[in-house]
Amino acid sequence: TNLYLAAEQRNAVVTALSAGCMILTGGPGTGKTTTINTIIKLLEDLKLSIALAAPTGRAAKRMSQVTGYEAKTIHRLLCTQRSSEGYSIFTHNEENPLPYDVIILDEVSMIDVNLMSSFLKAVKTGARIILSGDADQLPSVGPGNIIHDIIESKTIPVIQLNKIFRQAEESLIIVNAHKINHGELPDLSVKSSDFFFLRRKTPQDSAFTVMDLFKNRLPKSYNVNPISSIQVLSPTKKGLAGTIALNKLLQSHINPYDERRPQHVFGNITFRVGDKVMQTKNNYDMVYSREIGEDGMGIFN
């Protein structure tokens, strides 16, 4: 193909084909996906068996979409089973290693030390490991700061992608993300289709602005379903602009009470059919039925 790779991307490809283990890191829009796809193609040409994995179901799904290859969660890659004592154990370990010649892990910043330890124990002798992620992201919820610590150890090759490509430069989200990473304040007066800043004087005004954006303005401007396409984030739980109050406000406007729809009250929270909920734990055994009768497997976070 006529694919163009920047110098640091070419360096990453060469390193991936020559080193036993490497880290590929860089912020959004720096070409990590293009680099990974190039590496996968060359590894396939060498007839090597490849596995792709990520720490969460959503990250694995995204990895599958952008590479065109199946990606699994690390737990599924290692094959989680219940022991006779009821504990979760991995069937792939030192005694039963993974069969792959190359394993590519994405979103490494989200992996804690316990999961990384289990993964490394399951890698067969002579296999190649490629770790990809953004070192500037928050560390894992569990113990450890894997990608940062490995980079600081200076024991394996690290390729840092810094160049923001032209297509990514058109996204103000990506531009501002890099500004923040470099300690610069974004220009909040500049508005674009994917980033704009609205200032309100009170938390109550902020909450109603969020509701109006969610229910009316964003769906109308972008022709999207607010339930499936818009996610509201708040830095706090409490207060008029916190997640608890915002959830109640949005529910009252988007999914109000209807005697024809069942609802259940748990404490101070009312759940209704049609509410948007957050799945916080992967469940590979759960089968869900779609309206047309087809079955689908798994619910992932």
Regions found by a protein language model. Give the residues of each.
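Conserved helicase motor core of P-loop NTPases
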Residues: 1, 15, 132-298
